[in-house]
C-alpha cells in the first residue's frame, strides 16, 4: 500500500476546493494559512497555536487573519473593476459591508481602514448598527446605507447626521416609513438622501430564498412603488431619491437566479428613470455565496459560479438592459458581507477524548471459553469466527438482530450485566472485522455503503457549538473541519464531533468530504499526552454574533494576526474570552454577591463545627479562582 501523503489529506478534506487558495498543507503535515491566493508566504497553524499556548492563550481560540480580510475586499473590488473594463461599462462599482454579518468593532474598524482605497461603505439595519457605523465613518468619511425598519428617532438621527456632514442614504422599506420620513424632513427642514427597496417576484434559492419573491418581508410592491413616487412628487422630494435597492437572499447557489433578479431589478430601474426619477445607484443587495464544501455545485453549502463570473454577469446584465431601454447605466452597489468575511477567521480547539470502549483484559476469554457464555453471546462468537466476504451482509444483519435480542433479554431479567457487556464487546469485534473486509472491496456493495457509520466514534472537542458555529446546529450549515496537524499520516478513525455543552444537539454529524457532504470526519487516533487540535474554517460570517451562551459558555479567546515577512506573523490584538464571572453577569449574577453568600453560609457551618476554617478558606479560594477562569476546559 502506498504511503499516505499530504496530497491524500488535501483530497479527503477537499481543502484545495473550499480553501480559495488561502489554506494548504505544508511538508510537516500542518495546515497553513496564506495572506492571499497564490502567496508564497504562509503561517503554520500548529506552530501558531503552540506559540499562543506558550503565551497563556488557551483554546478554544478564534484566529482572525486580517490580511485575508483585506484581500477579500480587494478581490471583490478587482473583479468588478475588470468586468467594468471588459464590458465598457460607463459607471462605477462600490461595495458596502453589511455590519450585521459580523459587528465586532475590530472587524468593522479593519474593514473601514482597508476599504478607504476601495471607497467601501457600511450598511446598517438598526439603531445600534447606525451608531456604530457613524463612529466608524467619523474621520473616514465612509458612506452609510440604512436598511430595515425605522422609527422616528432613527429617521431624525439620520437626517441630522446628514446635516452635519455624514453621507447617509436612508432606504425606504415600507410606505408608512416614507410617510414618517416626509414628516420629519418637513419638520426639520433637512432634505434626506433616499433609496427605495423594491420587492421582486424573482427569488433566490436555498435557505434564504424567502428574502425575495412576492411574500418577502421587505420592499415595496410595484403598485406601492408607484404610490411612493406619487407621494414624493406631491411633497417636492422626488429628486431626493438616488438609489434603487433589491435583495433576493443570502448565499445564492445558482447563477441563473442572480441573473433573473438582475434582469427584473434593472428593468424596474429603467422604468423609474423613464418616470422621471433620477436614480444614480442600483443596489443589487447581497447573495454572493461562499463555496463552503468545495463542490462548486448548486447545493446550499456551495455555489455553481466563481467570483469573476458573478461580477461579469452583474455588469453585463445591467448594461444590456439599460442600453436596450435607452437609459443611463447606474453606479452599481453590492452588499457582499458573507463573501467578504467568511474566510478570514478560524476556530482552533483541542480534542479532549473520545468514546472508544476501554476493553478489559478478561473480555478476551469470550473467544476461548465459549462454554461459559449465554446462548446469544455464543451465537455472536460463532459469527465472529466464521465471517468472510461471502457472508458479510448476512453476518451483519444477524449481528444487529442478536445485539437487539441481548438488550431485550437483559430488560426481561434473563441476561445479567456482565453477559450484556460480553454481547456489546463481541459485537464491536464483529463490526471491525467486517469493516476490515469491506475496506478492501471494490466496488463496495450498495447495502454496505453506509456500513462504516456504525464504526463512527465521537470525539469530544473543547468548544460550544451553540456559541462558535451556531448555524451548524440551527440550519445544518456545513463548515470545513480539519485537523491542523499530522496530515502526513492517514486519519484512520471515523468520527463525529461533540462539544462540551450538556445538550445532545451539540454534535456535528455532517462534514465536508472529498465528494461533498459526508456523515463522518476522518481523524487520527490520539496519542498518549498529545495535544490534538482541529480547526473550524470559513466561520467569519454571522457565527460570532449569532452565537449564544448555552450552559453559559462565553466568547472564546480571539487573536488578530497579520503576516510579517521577517517573523512570519505578528499578533496585533488579543481579546480575552469570557471568564466565568462575565458569563454569570450576563444573566444577572454578581460575583461578589455570590462570594458573600457562600462565605456567610460557610461561617455558620464553621461556627457549628461542620467544616474547619481551613476547609472553608480553601473552598472560597477555589470558588474565586473558578470565577476568574475561562469558561472552557483547561487541563
From Swiss-Prot:
Taxonomic superkingdom: Bacteria
Classification via SUPFAM superfamilies: Alanine racemase C-terminal domain-like, PLP-binding barrel
Modification sites for N6-(pyridoxal phosphate)lysine: 100
EC supergroup of this enzyme: lyase
Cofactor(s), names only, from the UniProt record: Mg(2+); pyridoxal 5'-phosphate
UniProt-annotated binding residues for substrate: 282-292
Pathway: Amine and polyamine biosynthesis; agmatine biosynthesis; agmatine from L-arginine: step 1/1
E.C. number: 4.1.1.19
Keywords, alphabetical: Decarboxylase, Lyase, Magnesium, Metal-binding, Polyamine biosynthesis, Pyridoxal phosphate, Spermidine biosynthesis
Catalytically driven reaction(s): L-arginine + H(+) = agmatine + CO2
Function text: Catalyzes the biosynthesis of agmatine from arginine.
Family per similarity comment: Belongs to the Orn/Lys/Arg decarboxylase class-II family. SpeA subfamily.
Listed name of the protein: Biosynthetic arginine decarboxylase
Organism: Citrifermentans bemidjiense (strain ATCC BAA-1014 / DSM 16622 / JCM 12645 / Bem)
Lineage: Bacteria, Pseudomonadati, Thermodesulfobacteriota, Desulfuromonadia, Geobacterales
Amino acid at each position: 500500500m502506498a504511503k499516505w501523503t499530504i496530497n491524500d489529506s488535501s483530497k479527503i478534506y477537499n481543502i484545495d476546493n473550499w480553501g480559495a487558495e488561502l489554506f494548504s498543507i505544508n511538508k510537516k503535515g500542518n495546515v497553513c494559512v496564506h495572506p492571499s491566493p497564490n502567496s508564497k508566504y504562509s503561517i503554520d497553524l500548529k506552530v501558531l497555536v503552540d506559540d499562543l499556548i506558550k503565551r497563556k492563550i488557551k483554546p478554544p481560540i478564534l484566529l482572525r487573519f486580517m490580511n485575508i480580510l483585506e484581500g477579500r475586499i480587494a478581490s471583490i473590488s478587482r473583479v468588478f473593476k475588470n468586468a467594468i473594463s471588459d464590458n465598457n461599462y460607463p459607471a462605477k462599482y462600490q461595495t458596502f459591508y453589511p455590519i450585521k454579518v459580523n459587528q465586532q468593532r475590530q472587524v468593522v474598524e479593519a474593514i473601514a481602514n482597508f476599504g478607504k482605497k476601495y471607497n467601501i461603505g457600511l450598511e446598517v439595519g438598526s439603531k445600534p448598527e447606525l451608531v456604530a457605523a457613524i463612529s466608524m465613518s467619523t474621520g473616514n468619511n465612509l458612506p452609510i446605507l440604512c436598511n430595515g425598519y425605522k422609527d422616528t428617532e432613527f429617521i431624525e438621527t439620520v437626517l441630522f447626521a446628514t446635516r452635519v456632514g455624514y453621507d447617509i442614504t436612508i432606504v425606504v422599506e415600507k410606505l408608512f416609513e416614507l410617510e414618517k420620513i416626509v414628516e420629519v424632513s418637513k419638520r426639520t427642514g433637512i432634505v434626506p438622501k433616499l433609496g427605495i427597496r423594491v420587492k421582486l417576484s424573482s427569488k433566490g434559492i436555498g435557505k434564504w430564498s424567502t428574502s425575495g419573491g412576492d411574500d418577502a418581508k421587505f420592499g415595496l410592491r410595484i403598485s406601492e412603488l408607484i404610490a411612493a413616487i406619487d407621494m414624493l412628487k406631491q411633497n417636492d422630494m422626488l429628486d431626493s431619491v438616488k438609489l434603487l435597492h433589491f435583495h433576493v437572499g443570502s448565499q445564492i447557489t445558482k447563477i441563473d437566479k442572480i441573473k433573473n433578479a438582475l434582469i427584473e431589478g434593472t428593468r424596474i430601474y429603467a422604468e423609474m428613470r423613464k418616470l422621471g426619477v433620477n436614480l444614480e445607484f442600483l443596489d443589487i443587495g447581497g447573495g454572493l455565496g461562499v463555496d463552503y464544501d468545495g463542490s462548486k455545485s448548486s447545493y446550499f453549502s456551495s455555489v455553481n459560479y466563481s467570483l469573476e463570473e458573478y461580477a461579469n454577469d452583474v455588469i453585463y446584465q445591467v448594461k444590456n438592459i439599460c442600453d436596450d431601454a435607452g437609459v443611463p447605466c447606474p453606479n452599481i452597489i453590492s452588499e457582499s458581507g458573507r463573501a467578504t468575511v467568511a474566510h478570514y477567521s478560524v476556530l482552533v480547539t483541542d480534542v479532549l477524548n473520545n468514546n472508544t470502549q476501554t476493553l478489559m483484559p478478561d473480555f478476551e476469554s469470550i473467544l476461548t471459553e465459549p462454554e461459559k457464555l449465554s446462548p446469544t453471546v455464543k451465537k455472536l462468537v460463532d459469527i465472529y469466527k466464521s465471517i468472510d466476504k461471502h457472508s458479510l451482509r448476512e453476518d451483519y444483519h444477524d449481528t444487529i438482530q442478536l445485539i437487539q435480542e441481548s438488550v431485550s433479554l437483559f430488560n426481561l431479567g434473563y441476561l445479567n450485566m456482565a453477559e450484556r457487556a460480553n454481547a456489546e464487546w463481541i459485537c464491536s469485534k464483529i463490526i471491525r472485522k467486517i469493516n476490515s473486509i469491506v475496506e478492501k472491496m471494490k466496488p463496495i456493495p450498495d447495502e454496505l455503503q453506509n456500513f462504516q457509520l456504525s464504526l463512527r466514534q465521537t470525539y469530544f472537542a473543547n468548544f460550544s457549538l451553540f456559541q462558535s458555529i451556531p448555524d451548524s446546529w440551527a440550519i445544518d450549515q456545513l463548515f470545513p473541519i480539519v485537523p491542523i496537524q499530522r496530515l502526513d499520516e492517514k486519519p484512520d478513525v471515523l468520527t463525529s464531533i461533540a462539544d462540551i455543552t450538556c445538550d445532545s444537539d451539540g454534535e456535528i454529524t455532517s462534514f465536508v468530504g472529498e465528494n461533498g457532504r459526508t456523515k463522518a470526519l476522518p481523524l487520527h487516533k490520539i496519542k498518549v499526552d498529545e495535544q490534538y487540535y482541529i480547526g473550524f474554517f470559513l466561520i467569519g460570517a454571522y457565527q460570532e454574533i449569532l452565537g449564544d451562551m448555552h450552559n453559559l459558555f462565553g466568547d472564546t479567546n480571539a487573536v488578530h494576526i497579520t503576516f510579517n515577512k521577517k517573523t512570519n506573523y505578528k499578533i496585533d490584538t488579543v481579546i480575552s474570552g469570557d471568564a466565568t464571572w462575565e458569563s454569570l453577569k450576563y444573566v444577572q449574577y454578581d460575583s461578589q454577591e455570590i462570594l458573600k453568600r457562600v462565605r456567610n453560609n460557610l461561617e455558620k457551618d464553621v461556627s457549628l463545627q461542620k467544616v474547619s476554617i481551613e476547609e472553608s478558606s480553601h473552598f472560597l479560594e477555589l470558588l474565586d479562582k473558578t470565577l476568574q477562569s475561562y469558561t472552557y476546559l483547561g487541563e
